[in-house]
């Protein structure tokens, strides 16, 4: 949704804002003053991205396209487990994407959902369970290969990081929410394992999470994650709401979010990468982000033909559910 390009990537969006304010205020002077004020505020509160050399160590180590195992490779092993991390390394992944959530007593653990029902033999919201209760659950209980992983437990963030470092894997920390808690927990992890500054990245669908992370530690490499129409439609394209007016409201919000992501929020947060749903990635799309000094990582790329296309034709790193075979995407 770029209007036109300039070196900083802000000419297009602020020209649009100026025109919009001209229409609303009907005063060239007021429109110029308001637009200038918004621009100065953005520049004042925005963060500089980390040096591109450091970011590329994570995104394209050894100057090659990276294959990142989604949730550790959720098709090949129980997702977000130490077994998944080990399998990802064994199967040739460059790195892993891991989801961070918190127990009721504030322990950061690996979990994608806000409930434990889908992946474990337990039930209930994770935020209502203590770490001691969570530790008793079996995260392999509902996996297709559960018999091959009988002794898995939900790992802590620290345990997962230690395992990844043992296998020389880059890490994409996917933060689901709790901006303050997550940024504090990750800051502690980065202080304990300073090598993470050069082989990991924090990413989120939520701009407030990334902004808080940059506030907490500006040396951390960050990325925004995005899927167009995510507020109004599920991952498989179905409308989220049956009521027409409600669905329409969220469609409008999706348009605003998409425009903000591509035109303002990337600059405000000072990101180094943009994680985009694969169906919206094209050579032209990559070129536009590259002009801003930002790498695109595509998700979720799950067939051999798609992987070959992203590696050979696009030269784009990608996230996949399986390093071994074709599989359906996990949203």
Curated annotation (Swiss-Prot):
Tissue specificity of this protein: Detected in heart, brain, lung, liver, skeletal muscle, kidney, pituitary and testis.
Residues noted as binding Mg(2+) in the record, renumbered to the chain: 97, 99, 174
Signal peptide feature range: none
InterPro entries for this protein: GP_PDE_dom (IPR030395), PLC-like_Pdiesterase_TIM-brl (IPR017946)
PROSITE patterns documented for this protein: GP_PDE
Known outcome of mutating residue 99 to A: Strongly reduced activity
Principal subcellular localization: membrane
Name this protein carries in UniProt: Glycerophosphodiester phosphodiesterase 1
Organism: Rattus norvegicus
